[in-house]
Amino acid sequence: MTDQHRPLQSENRSEHIIDALQQARKTRSPVYINGGGSKQHLMGRNCDYTVLDVSEHRGIVDYQPQELVITARAGTPLVDIIAVLAAEGQSLSFEPPLFNGIATLGGTLACNLSGPARPWSGSIRDMVLGVQLINGKCERLNFGGKVIKNVAGYDVSRLQAGALGTLGVLCEVSLKVLPRAEKTLTLCYDMSAPEAVRHMNQRAGQPKPLSGAVWLNGQLHLRLSGAASAVDSTVVQWGGEILESGDILWEQLREMTLPFFNDAGALWRFSVQSSAEVRLDFGTT
């Protein structure tokens, strides 16, 4: 690994993490794992806990561009990883929120945040090759590996996705990465929500470089990402208006800063079949 692959800050603080966990075991104190602190709103109720700061446990451990695999410590900011990959013409294969640059690799895996490209590119869970963690007994454990063709045993490493740190403190994560898309653009169409659902399902079933779909303010937005020839040919076939500010739209969706995220009313999420018709009936209060 050359110097260009090393972020400015790199430090192995795993021994400090073990010491802190040993002290918490002695006092039988719950532990709150904190990296960048960008996902505190996802951690449920407050309780009397010991804060374990892992933000200084950071740095790229190994990166082999030709193997499409990167290994980094859990406290590494995602922006550092993205910059390292971009220098080699590569990118993360999922699309996590960066939360003003403070989101870390470990927190992203622990919360399983993968962004608007998830239905097409997969989640961070799908891209995890291996992890190193420290469990509640202060044991350092390794699962998976650092190669794409890893068939050794049960895939425990992927169980960390969405576990919120309950299975141990993440120390290192190995991820599969991909070449960056040669071209990306967004098409938009004026249509109602039911029309958008039908349109999205029709388009999603075609072998095209679709990487995002959202209906917003009476318009369906479809993002295309991939080889320039594939994107251009899809534009010719699908038509629609090219949205010049498409990058801003997807960034706001990824970062959850679109206006509806901050609406005073309740925000509900439903996970259903894409073709399902959702009817809401909450009765009377």
Each language-model region and where it sits:
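N-terminal glycine-rich flavin-associated loop
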Residues: 2-33, 54-100, 113-145, 181-191
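Glycine-rich beta-strand-to-loop/alpha-helix junction loops that act as flexible
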Residues: 33-39
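Transmembrane alpha-helical segments of multi-pass membrane transport proteins and ion-pumping complexes
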Residues: 39-40, 111
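Short glycine-biased active-site loop of nucleotidyltransferases that positions the nucleotide triphosphate
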Residues: 40-46
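Short helix/loop capping segments that flank catalytic or ligand/cofactor-binding pockets
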Residues: 42, 81, 142, 231-233
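Short, well-ordered secondary-structure micro-motifs within conserved domains or adaptor modules
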Residues: 47-52
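FAD-binding subdomain of flavoenzyme oxidoreductases
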Residues: 94-95, 101-213, 219-220
